[in-house]
């Protein structure tokens, strides 16, 4: 018996993995997660997550059109997420977006994950891309940290999942609309730059 946590509050708990989200959820309801219970609760969470994981998943406004435009302009696109690879691919398939990406890596794709630069560098390697010819777009401190550590310019979106104000993350640019991305990316990395 715990109180329900409003969706807007949950939004601020997302971004550092399911275990951290559970810890934050427990703290929000007034009681810390009991030591040793995390594995059991993770199993329960993942069971419910797998049953209804796509019910509320939608791209943010302008994302699909912008991805299509960037791809048509000759940019390679990738996803570098800490979400496990399998669920990431399932979501992309349900949304009909998997064909837009040249590489997709999850938190279980390499021995390391964001903010370790090996995660982003490994993703770039799958596309035969160099850090100087890439741009990271993200919504969290982990995204900015991995980009910085890998030597990749980074653009942060202002409407993502972070507990820190996005303008304090240290990104090179902050955008309020995904539609603004195309012009900024073209300035940072001209099409065809290797």
List the predicted regions and their residue ranges:
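Short polybasic/polar patches that bind polyanions
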Residues: 1, 23, 27, 71, ...
